[in-house]
Swiss-Prot record:
NCBIfam families: rpsL_bact. The lineage of its organism: Bacteria, Pseudomonadati, Thermodesulfobacteriota, Desulfovibrionia, Desulfovibrionales. The gene is rpsL. HAMAP family: Ribosomal_uS12_B (MF_00403_B). InterPro entries: NA-bd_OB-fold, Ribosomal_uS12, Ribosomal_uS12_bac. This is Small ribosomal subunit protein uS12. GO terms for molecular function: rRNA binding; structural constituent of ribosome; tRNA binding. One of its GO terms (biological process) is translation.
Amino acid sequence: MPTINQLIRKGREKQLKRKKTPALQACPQRRGVCTRVYTTTPKKPNSALRKVARVRLTNAIEVTAYIGGEGHNLQEHSVVLIRGGRVKDLPGVRYHIVRGSLDTAGVADRRQGRSKYGAKRPK
């Protein structure tokens, strides 16, 4: 515990808050090019093949982004838009690919929560 005099001389040091999406550099989304599209397995209690892509952003940072929804059309050199948002059971995946924008197609036959998957309203 510092004395009053020590606090007057030095003051308290501000605790810095770690950013959750540093690669976006305070932008809402960022554009990038897929360098690798592959599947990974999630952490311990879960089991699946999660679709992810390694993306090189326009600011030259390379990140791993999750491809949400059922089925996708992404391959190497696809231009994608990424947003923040981690995937809890995939370590190191802190970004999501925005469906229905740039080269990413929306999810086909999606009826509920369509706006999150870039799906048009069914007739």
